[in-house]
Every structure is written in C-alpha cells, then in structure tokens.
Swiss-Prot record:
Descriptive protein name: Ribosome maturation factor RimM
GO biological process: ribosomal small subunit biogenesis; rRNA processing
Major localization listed first in the record, in broad terms: cytoplasm
Keyword Cytoplasm: yes
An example Gene Ontology CC term for this record: ribosome
Organism this protein belongs to: Saccharophagus degradans (strain 2-40 / ATCC 43961 / DSM 17024)
UniProt entry keywords in alphabetical sequence: Chaperone, Cytoplasm, Ribosome biogenesis, rRNA processing
Domain PRC barrel: residue ranges: 102-183
Length: 183
C-alpha cells in the first residue's frame, strides 16, 4: 500500500494532518497547515508520519467539502484502510518548498531561534522561539525562556519587520527585535 522511506527528521516539514475518515470508500479528512490551504495538494510525494515509521503516499483524488478538504490516497480503497491512517501527521521533504525572497522565512526556519532585544539600547536575551502563530493582523513569535534568558517569562512578540523585528540571521540562529522586555 505505502512505500517506507528513510526518515531524516531534520528534512521533514509537517504540512497537514489526517484527522479522520470520510465515507466508506477510503477517503480521509485532511487538515492542511499550508497557506493557502490547497497548497498541500501541490506536494508529491506526501509522507505519513506513522507510529511504524514514515510512509510515502500520493493523493489519488481530492474534494473541498463543507467539512473541509477530503482526499483519497492511492492504495486506500475502503473505510477500514482509511481508519488505520487517522490520526497521522502529513509531511514533505524540505527540498520541495519553493525558494523565498531574502526577507521572507518559513515558520519552521524561525522556530528554535534565539530572540535578543535591543530595546532602548540594552541588549537582552528573551529566550527561544517555540512556535509562530497567525493572528490575522500579523504573525506572532511565541518566545519561551531558557537558561540564557533574562527571566523565566513567556513572551509574545509581533513579527512585524522593521518595526519590532530588526534582523533575522539564520546562520547565527538569532532574531534581533526592538521589544520592551517588560511585555
């Protein structure tokens, strides 16, 4: 049914999640984490991160339903086979992602970077980006403290280039912000 692939965790990016089954003919509900949501359909092969390892698969058919995106994977032809898949994360190899402009970054590139503020000329370590959230107005960095940070507070820093985010240096694994550490 699926081809096992060698898992190189650092090369896999989660782009969605199979959340349940739809109907009796092997269709599954696919929650896409891409923006726009239908971008998940552009990637092939998809990699299912199962408890038995990473399995390669391809989408045979898809439909947009009121309940969301539903797909039928090649080799999954009945409800029993579909039930064996849910819930499972759906990933792709990083190499499938398109190149971005110099000042654009994928969220996974920002996660794990150290955040340093230069607020009022004082350089202080705020912690590490644990995740990035979409809020509608702008993305927000969730910064968690660690042994190097100035205190043990969690912080939410708006990802607004030039205003708050002054520099993202992937090679130095650091984001420089101008953010009041009291917030």
């Amino acid at each position: 049914m699926f081809t096992p692939v060698e898992a190189k965790k650092s090369n896999l990016i989660t782009v969605g999640r199979i959340t349940g089954v739809f109907g009796i003919k092997g269709w599954v509900k696919l929650k896409s984490f891409t923006d726009p949501q239908d971008n998940v359909l552009e990637y092939s092969p998809l990699l299912l991160k199962t408890k038995h390892g990473v399995k390669e698969c391809e989408i045979a058919e898809y439909q947009f339903r009121p309940q969301g995106l539903v797909v039928r994977l090649k080799g999954v032809d009945d409800r029993n086979a579909a039930e064996a898949l849910a819930p499972v994360d759906v990933a792709i190899d990083k190499s499938l992602l398109p190149e971005l402009d110099d000042d654009d970054f994928y969220w996974h590139q920002l996660e794990g970077l150290r955040v340093v503020t230069i607020y009022e000329g004082n350089t202080q370590d705020l912690g590490v980006v644990s995740k990035v959230m979409a809020t509608g107005a702008n993305d927000v960095l969730e910064v968690k403290p660690d042994a190097q940070s100035i205190d043990d507070r969690d912080r939410l820093v708006p990802y607004v280039l030039d205003l708050y985010v002054k520099k993202v240096d992937l090679s130095a694994e650091c984001i420089t912000v101008d953010w009041d550490p009291e917030f």
